[in-house]
Design a protein with these regions (language model features):
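Alpha-helical transmembrane segments within multi-pass membrane transporters and channels
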Residues: 113-156, 300
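Inter-helical junctions in multi-pass inner-membrane proteins, predominant
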Residues: 48-64, 68, 163-166, 208-209, ...
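Loop-to-transmembrane alpha-helix initiation sites
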Residues: 27, 148, 189-197, 238, ...
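Transmembrane alpha-helical segments in multi-pass inner-membrane proteins
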Residues: 249, 260, 264-326
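Single transmembrane alpha-helix segments in multi-pass membrane proteins
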Residues: 41-42, 58-109, 139-146, 280, ...
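Cytosolic-side transmembrane-helix boundaries in multi-pass membrane proteins
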Residues: 1-46, 202, 229-236, 307-373
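Helix-loop-helix "hairpin" substructures at the membrane interface of multi-pass membrane proteins
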Residues: 118-126, 133-137, 190-264
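Transmembrane helix-bundle core of multi-pass membrane transporters
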Residues: 144, 148-210, 237-240, 259-269, ...
């Protein structure tokens, strides 16, 4: 009997294995959305992808996206590790503000603001305080059993107040070429912030994928009970990821403040924690913990930054910017949802899977006679 034709009536042509493998890759949809945003900007501004060399530095919209997206990439990097353990860190925005405020305050009051020792000391102070914030978050979550959203929400509010106390509610301006290098300098024609972010992403990826750390994080986030039964000490691991998250936020704060040569305790890092969570989710990491994707997080952060650039290019009114961003992010999340894609595919095809039709009774009888003459 001739087998049914897959392209006949009542059937949908099956996708090639290569296509299924490509679309099933966790980085496919974030990369596709990023490419669509870039192509949309090209349609609006034909020289959007143009990169030129001026005064020995690379300039262009793509370079701007990478440079201004570097702080968000770092914050999202630490947020990914926290979310992978079924946690959340809402204090990263305040940590960004505190780090920038401490560094600028130290440089502004130093005898030699432009010297390397002064800048180095400012960086150490900022990173040290950020590590203490991460330790406090980890202690509240791992040792005292406080819900992560509650523990970090406390420091989100208190940390913003600390940043305002450091700056006395004013904007602290500094003049230090060495400090400016962190967020606004160039090295080998590329923005130093981009190189620094790429290096930290590479190191984090190497540590989490080439050592047992990544497996332990996924184990604790995927099944805390089972990981505890096999002897994994989750408390120390949780403290570690919160410290890493705070340090990433501190470096982002140094980038932001050095790029503008000032610290604003009121607005620096404001709502960056929400953009970081969006970047992590858009990148394919589930808020329920477990498996995580650092590459997807980087793509998610670039999507958020490209979206912000697109909003300015379109001239969207400021009062509707957040609504516009939310709508686009919802679309991105739906596109990545396997259930949504399956439902959309069924509706667009117009036909569901074919139910096998039983062979007529006469054919069955004839076959039996052939087998048993």
């Amino acid at each position: 009997m001739t087998p049914p034709d897959d392209t006949g009536t009542g059937t949908r042509p099956a996708r090639a294995p290569g296509t299924r493998r490509l679309t099933g890759h966790p980085l496919f949809w974030p990369a596709a959305v990023l490419a669509a945003l870039l192509l949309g900007n090209v349609a609006l501004t034909h020289d959007f992808l143009a990169v030129r060399v001026q005064n020995g530095h690379l300039y262009g919209s793509l370079v701007d996206i990478l440079q201004f997206g570097a702080p968000l990439i770092l914050v999202s990097l630490g947020m990914t590790l926290v979310i992978a353990t079924r946690g959340i860190d809402l204090s990263v925005g305040s940590t960004v503000a505190i780090a920038g405020a401490l560094a600028c305050e130290h440089i502004a009051t130093a005898a030699d603001p432009g010297s390397l020792p002064t800048v180095f000391t400012a960086i150490v102070i900022a990173l040290g305080v950020a590590a203490a914030i991460g330790l406090l978050n980890g202690f509240l979550v791992a040792r005292l059993g406080v819900q992560p959203i509650v523990a970090t929400l406390v420091l989100m509010v208190a940390g913003r107040g600390v940043a305002q106390l450091i700056t006395d509610g004013q904007i602290i301006s500094v003049s230090s070429p060495a400090y400016k290098m962190i967020g606004g300098g160039y090295w080998f024609t590329l923005p130093f912030a981009v190189l620094l972010a790429a290096a930290l992403v590479a190191v984090t990826s190497l540590v989490t994928r080439r050592t047992a750390l990544g497996m332990l994080i996924e184990s604790v986030g995927g099944n805390p009970v089972a990981s505890r039964l096999v002897g994994i000490r989750a408390s120390g691991l949780l403290v570690t990821v919160y410290v890493v998250s705070a340090l990433c936020a501190a470096v982002a704060g140094l980038m932001i403040s050095s790029n503008v040569s000032s610290a604003d305790g009121n607005n620096a890092g404001l709502w960056i924690e929400l953009d970081a969570i969006l970047a992590v989710v858009v990148g394919g990491t589930a808020l329920t913990g477990g498996r995580f994707s650092l590459g997807g997080t980087v793509l998610g952060a670039l999507i958020i930054q490209t979206l912000s650039t697109t909003i300015y290019t379109l001239g969207v009114p400021p009062e509707t910017t957040l609504v516009f961003k939310a709508l686009v992010v919802i679309v991105v999340c739906l596109v990545q949802s396997p259930a949504f894609r399956a439902r959309f595919s069924r509706k667009s095809g117009g036909r569901g899977p074919v139910t096998p039709v039983p062979a007529p009774a006469a054919d069955v009888t004839a076959r039996r006679q052939e087998v048993h003459p």
